[in-house]
Amino acid sequence: MARLIFHFVFALILAAYLLSVTDAIPRGWQEPCFCPSKNPYCDCGDDLQVPTTSVISPKPIIEQCARCERNSQCNKVCPATCKYKVCIFNRTCEFSTCHCYRC
């Protein structure tokens, strides 16, 4: 009888642990999106980028580039009313710093 109770308690502890582990796994998590990309889940749109590591000048040379619409960190910077973004690409860390403009 004691063995049966021990196995029952052990099974409950194991089930509780497995449930807590599966709840901790993020659902629907995707890899960060870098554009341009061949990933079909990346929604890449047009953006404006300043290809320089220096501070943005009053009249920067702006060229068309790609960005992610939904899941790029750059997008979280701008509100929905933003007309366009200018991004300064930092070659050291391979990351763009973006600023919003309403022009």
UniProtKB/Swiss-Prot annotation:
GO terms for biological process: defense response to fungus; killing of cells of another organism. Keywords: Antimicrobial, Disulfide bond, Fungicide, Plant defense, Secreted, Signal. Disulfide bonds join 44-103, 68-87, 74-98, 78-100. One of its GO terms (cellular component) is extracellular region. Residues 1-24 form the signal peptide. Its main location: secreted. It is found in: Secreted. It comes from the Eukaryota. Belongs to the DEFL family. This is Defensin-like protein 268.
